[in-house]
């Protein structure tokens, strides 16, 4: 049976496991170590763990300063505060001088659940993607997260990574030939009729949707686009040419995120039907995470409907 683990937990354990290997790695949190799972790094390496309290903007500024001293800071808080409250400091103190700071936003998307709209950050992909030079990613499972963390430690420059609250099935470790590389998507399943490009926990939904489509005689390709920026344009173009219809799916506002990135690129280079699946420009609501996701159609059935819509739009 596949491992089921929240990407936030996989992240916290992976970061802690790298503490000895990378003595310049430092970890910041804003009084949320138990939720963001940086508690594992704190336990493993307390002298390089800094709890800044509920002062996210200050935390980013201090991390920027430490990066100038040769350290590799990972800054942690909820996605709403990382992409929202501290956005100006991320833009001006980290991205503008192109400093080597990694901003990690946990509890992203609708699946925060009961905390409701004020904490359901569905805008972080768009907000962070708009910052020049900012790498933006959201791994889909524990295996991919572990690989992403070390890749980020060795990546020089500013980056934003979203983590999820819910435990999700590990799927990438059973894909033949799977490998992780920043800026490069991974084809998890081949298909000829439509391509589903997914990010984060929507990858698992996309694989389930592909099974449902197969039952209807539709061959769906599934791409795990863990890195939203820079977008793997080569892989997107290949899928566009070979399947002639694309669905993007994300646990985020469809404005400015993965769907926008794919549509912008293909609109200028190889126009085909692109249908975006995600939150349609509205706030979230409070409730059990699975119920909230279903209320917004963020599930396999929602992806199936969008895939059939994209196929119907083919010329």
Which stretches of residues belong to each language-model region?
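Thiamine diphosphate
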Residues: 1-162, 167, 302, ...
């Amino acid at each position: 049976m596949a491992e089921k683990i929240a990407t936030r937990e996989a992240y916290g354990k992976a970061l802690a496991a790298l503490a000895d290997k990378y003595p310049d790695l430092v970890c910041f949190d804003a009084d949320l170590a138990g939720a963001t799972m940086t508690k594992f790094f704190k336990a493993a390496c307390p002298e390089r763990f800094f709890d800044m309290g509920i002062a996210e903007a200050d935390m980013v500024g201090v991390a920027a300063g430490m990066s100038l001293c040769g350290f590799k800071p990972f800054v942690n808080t909820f996605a709403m505060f990382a992409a929202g409250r501290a956005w100006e400091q991320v833009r001006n103190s980290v991205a503008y001088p192109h400093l080597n700071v990694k901003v990690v936003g946990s509890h992203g998307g609708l699946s925060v659940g009961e905390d409701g709209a004020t904490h359901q950050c569905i805008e972080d992909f768009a907000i962070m993607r708009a910052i020049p030079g900012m790498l933006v990613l959201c791994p889909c499972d524990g295996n991919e997260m572990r690989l992403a963390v070390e890749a980020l430690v060795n990546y020089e420059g500013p980056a934003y990574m979203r983590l999820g609250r819910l435990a999700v099935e590990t799927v990438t470790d059973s894909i033949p030939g799977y490998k992780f590389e920043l800026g490069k998507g991974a084809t998890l399943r081949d298909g000829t009729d439509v391509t589903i490009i997914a990010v984060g926990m929507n990858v698992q939904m996309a694989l389930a949707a592909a099974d449902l489509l197969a039952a209807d005689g539709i061959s769906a390709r599934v791409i795990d686009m863990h890195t939203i920026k820079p977008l793997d344009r080569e892989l997107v173009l290949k899928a566009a040419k070979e399947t002639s219809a694309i669905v993007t799916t994300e646990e985020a506002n469809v404005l400015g995120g993965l769907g926008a990135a794919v549509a912008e690129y293909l609109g200028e280079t190889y126009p085909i039907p692109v249908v975006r699946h995600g939150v349609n420009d509205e706030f979230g609501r409070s409730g059990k995470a699975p119920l909230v996701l279903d209320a917004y159609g963020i599930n396999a059935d929602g992806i199936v409907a969008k895939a059939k819509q994209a196929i119907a739009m083919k010329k």
